């Protein structure tokens, strides 16, 4: 294997940034990384998005998820399957919802909801093993461990929904 290039980012806050700042906070860096804007591009084999794809103080919904998927697909030189995701605290659900349904459906690290996420597990350059909240993949002699924020009980007291 030649040089492996890993790009890591987090806290895109996709829907809230689009709503408040009219900024595509996930699509813009993807375009920049591919050199399709004023910024110079750079080589990457894998993009790790380390959580908080949503920036809302409330649980994300279908509209937010569809926007995330749209912005991931801004990539022209890379496949969605080259992008690996973790859930952050803003990506969480409430106690009365299926645990992390939004993350599992739209960010879909295991490729179980391809019809919503566009992630085809057979197309992963480095196949994943594990579960949506803790999984791993291997690149050469490096094992990458991905551990999400579960947030099963809903927002902590400091972010109690009003």
Specify the residue positions occupied by each region the protein language model found:
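Extended active-site neighborhood of metal-dependent phosphoesterases/phosphodiesterases
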Residues: 58-161
């Amino acid at each position: 294997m030649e040089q492996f290039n890993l790009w890591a980012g987090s806290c895109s806050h996709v829907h809230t940034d689009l709503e408040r700042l009219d900024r595509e906070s996930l699509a813009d860096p993807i375009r920049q990384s591919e050199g399709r804007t004023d910024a110079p591009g750079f080589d990457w084999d894998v993009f790790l998005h380390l959580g908080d794809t949503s920036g809302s103080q409330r649980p994300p919904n279908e509209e937010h998820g569809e926007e995330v998927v749209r912005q991931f697909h801004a990539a022209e030189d890379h496949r969605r399957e080259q992008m690996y995701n973790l859930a952050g605290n803003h990506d969480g659900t409430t106690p009365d919802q299926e645990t992390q349904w939004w993350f599992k459906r739209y960010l879909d690290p295991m490729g179980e909801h391809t019809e919503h996420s566009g992630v085809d597990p057979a197309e992963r350059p480095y196949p994943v093993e594990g579960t949506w909240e803790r999984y791993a993949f291997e690149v050469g002699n490096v094992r990458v461990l991905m551990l999400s924020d579960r947030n099963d009980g809903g927002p902590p007291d400091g972010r109690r929904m009003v």
